[in-house]
């Protein structure tokens, strides 16, 4: 794939290099600066070179331990530092979690993601979530966990329990990280990601846009993700959900075209990663979501809630996928097509 020098004419001499392994921040910003339709077109081409553009991976996300987090992330209603009227709750019962996973599978989800509002788990917490992971794996689903920063040996324990993916987002541009979070450093996130990779787990790692960042700072986030080696298997792109009581509850709305640009640039720079539409999708019109899928998004969170904030319900997602002739990615053999159609309610038409 080539990028037109004319389309990239700008004051800086920096030009994007889509085949380069290392992405400079200015290279990524140059991609953001392409004419909108040209950028989406190039991202769509990259997407089709690496994926079936009609397949969408469906994940369900459940908060198994909500509220009372000691971190002070400016975007998060679960922080104990913010007055969001979200109380601290005990961890859900294992049987209740498994029942939620069964429901998610019956509705077409292939991956069950679990989140806990911790800075990091204690050894006893790892034992508890390991039992949960084993139970969910027994249902035939992929598992993903987001439990905060890990100590030595914890990633190996989670891997042994059957965890497939570990989510640990880089949140924002490293250069502004401590404008958003003061209780940890960007380097702390990188440390846990290293532990996760060394344990043989797959990585789910993305960030949040719409936190009053500049385009250059969005480029910095994407560059930091694209330069992970190897690149994340899953890249969730969150659009800030403004919650009253958080420091960012009055953030300026991110223009929809800028969000689509972010999806497109993520696809170009991380061609073999699943790019997921994550938080904020409930406020996205169908046409905007369709543009995101065209620009390379191929995964969504499926279910009416993401941790503590709203998400489109399953019926709405089924209708949208039918309109766009998309279908769930959760099978490898043609013999499983009927089972997928029955579970999701979505007609699979090759």
Curated annotation (Swiss-Prot):
UniProt GO molecular function: 2 iron, 2 sulfur cluster binding; 4 iron, 4 sulfur cluster binding; biotin synthase activity; iron ion binding
Domain Radical SAM core: 54-278
E.C. number: 2.8.1.6
Gene3D superfamilies: Aldolase class I (3.20.20.70)
InterPro entries linked to this entry: Aldolase_TIM (IPR013785), BATS_dom (IPR010722), Biotin_synth/BioAB (IPR002684), Biotin_synthase (IPR024177), Elp3/MiaA/NifB-like_rSAM (IPR006638), rSAM (IPR007197)
Organism superkingdom: Bacteria
Free-text remark on how the cofactor is bound: Binds 1 [4Fe-4S] cluster. The cluster is coordinated with 3 cysteines and an exchangeable S-adenosyl-L-methionine.
Keyword Metal-binding included in the entry's annotation: yes
Residues reported in the UniProt entry to bind [4Fe-4S] cluster: 69, 73, 76
Cofactor(s) listed in the protein's UniProt record: [4Fe-4S] cluster; [2Fe-2S] cluster
Pathway the protein takes part in: Cofactor biosynthesis; biotin biosynthesis; biotin from 7,8-diaminononanoate: step 2/2
Listed PANTHER family: BIOTIN SYNTHASE (PTHR22976), BIOTIN SYNTHASE, MITOCHONDRIAL (PTHR22976:SF2)
NCBIfam families xrefs: bioB
HAMAP family, per the entry: BioB
Name assigned to this protein: Biotin synthase
């Amino acid at each position: 794939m080539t990028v037109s020098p004319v389309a990239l004419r700008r004051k800086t001499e920096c030009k994007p290099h889509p085949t380069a392994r290392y992405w400079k921040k200015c290279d990524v910003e140059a991609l953001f600066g392409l004419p909108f339709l040209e950028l989406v077109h190039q991202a769509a081409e990259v997407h089709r070179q690496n994926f079936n553009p009609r397949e969408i991976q469906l994940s369900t996300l459940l908060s198994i331990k909500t509220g009372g987090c000691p971190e002070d992330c400016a975007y998060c209603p679960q922080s104990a530092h913010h007055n969001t009227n979200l109380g601290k709750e005990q961890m859900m019962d294992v049987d209740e979690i498994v029942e939620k996973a069964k429901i998610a599978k019956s509705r077409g989800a292939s991956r069950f993601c679990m989140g806990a509002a911790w800075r990091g788990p204690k050894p006893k917490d790892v034992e508890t979530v390991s039992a949960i992971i084993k139970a969910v794996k027994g249902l035939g689903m992929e598992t993903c966990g987001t439990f905060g920063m890990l100590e030595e040996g914890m990633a190996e324990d989670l891997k042994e329990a059957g965890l497939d993916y570990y989510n640990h987002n880089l949140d924002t541009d490293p250069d502004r990280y401590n404008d958003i979070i003061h209780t940890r450093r960007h380097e702390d996130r990188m440390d846990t990601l290293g532990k996760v990779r060394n344990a043989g787990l797959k990585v789910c790692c993305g960030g949040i846009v719409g936190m009053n960042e500049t385009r250059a700072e969005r480029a910095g986030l994407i560059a930091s993700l694209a330069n992970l080696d190897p690149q994340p298997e899953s890249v969730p792109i969150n659009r800030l959900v403004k919650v009253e009581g958080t420091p960012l509850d009055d953030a300026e709305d991110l223009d929809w075209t800028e969000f689509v640009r972010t999806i497109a640039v993520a696809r170009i720079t991380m061609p073999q990663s699943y790019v997921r539409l994550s938080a904020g999708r409930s406020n996205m019109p169908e046409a905007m979501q369709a543009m995101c899928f065209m620009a390379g998004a191929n995964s969504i969170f499926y279910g009416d809630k993401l941790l503590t904030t709203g998400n489109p319900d399953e019926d709405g997602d089924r209708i949208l996928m039918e309109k766009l002739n998309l279908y769930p990615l959760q099978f490898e053999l043609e013999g499983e097509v009927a089972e997928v159609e029955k579970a999701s309610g979505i007609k699979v038409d090759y």
